[in-house]
From Swiss-Prot:
GO biological process entries: proteasome-mediated ubiquitin-dependent protein catabolic process
GO cellular component terms, semicolon-separated: cytoplasm; proteasome core complex, alpha-subunit complex
The keyword Cell membrane is assigned to this record: no
Record-linked PANTHER family: PROTEASOME SUBUNIT ALPHA/BETA (PTHR11599)
Stated name of the protein: Proteasome subunit alpha
Alphabetical list of Pfam families matching this protein: Proteasome, Proteasome_A_N
């Protein structure tokens, strides 16, 4: 039970606390910390996203749920937090990318797309009658500026990274990346590093619960690896554990 002095700040999205906080935005951040982890890594050759889909039931069909979503042929996004909120933002991002391609006959810049999504997120921190999106996104792709990787948060802030992680155990994954990351990697090394980073905090017992997508500087196209490719790579790296 919150004390009366705090109750108004705690419940209202349009009121700052005396400490300069908007509590509903901070609570949305807590939802992100409890989400399934996602890793993004950028290197000289391109950019990769890898994410975990946890088995929530023995009857769970992992193929029915995506964790990495293609936005356009050159860009993808992976969420952590409330997946229902993520679906709204993914659909919005796809609409923005499609409209840009239709109007200008060219693929949208990854940062421009990220900013559009974050503008929508930020609006939901200003107006009453709604709550912030309880989801963070990693948005990755290759455009005319090269490989791009951005992390967004529920407040609408976005920051570019060479390597980052969101979701549960993101602190452990980030520590691994800080120790092992180098920009001068080929695409294969970049993918392997992302998987190793994920495995540093998550026990992978089923390759069907891991998704990988990457884009190279040369091709400028985002490609999702098949389940067989992911299984082969996890086995090669010794990351697939027996359940």
């Amino acid at each position: 039970m919150f004390p009366p002095a705090m109750a108004g700040y705690d419940r209202a999205i349009t009121i700052f606390s005396p400490e300069g906080k908007i509590y509903q935005v901070e609570y949305a951040g807590e939802a992100v910390k409890r989400g399934w982890p996602t890793v993004g890594v950028k290197c000289k050759a391109g950019v990769v996203l890898t994410a975990e889909k946890r088995k929530i039931s023995a009857l769970f069909d992992s193929s029915s749920l995506e964790k990495i979503y293609l936005i356009d042929e050159h860009v993808a996004a992976s969420p952590s937090g409330l997946l229902a909120d993520a679906r709204i933002l993914i659909d919005y991002a796809r609409d923005v990318a499609l409209s840009h391609r239709f109007i200008y006959d060219e693929p949208i810049d990854v940062e421009f797309l990220t900013k559009a999504v974050c503008n929508l997120k930020q609006q939901y921190t200003q107006f009453g009658g709604a709550r912030p999106f309880g989801v963070a996104l990693l948005i990755a792709g290759v455009d005319r500026h090269g490989a791009r990787l951005y992390q967004t948060d529920p407040s609408g802030v976005y920051i570019g990274y060479f390597a980052t992680a969101i979701g549960a155990e993101s602190g452990t994954i980030t520590e691994f990346l800080e120790k092992n990351y180098k920009f001068d990697m080929e695409m294969g090394e970049c993918i392997e590093l992302a998987l190793k980073a994920l495995a540093s905090a998550v026990e992978i017992t089923d390759s069907a619960n891991v998704e990988v997508a990457y884009a190279t500087i040369e091709e400028k196209k985002m490609r999702k690896m098949s389940q067989d490719e992911v299984a082969s790579l996890l086995t090669k790296l010794g990351l697939l554990k027996k359940s």
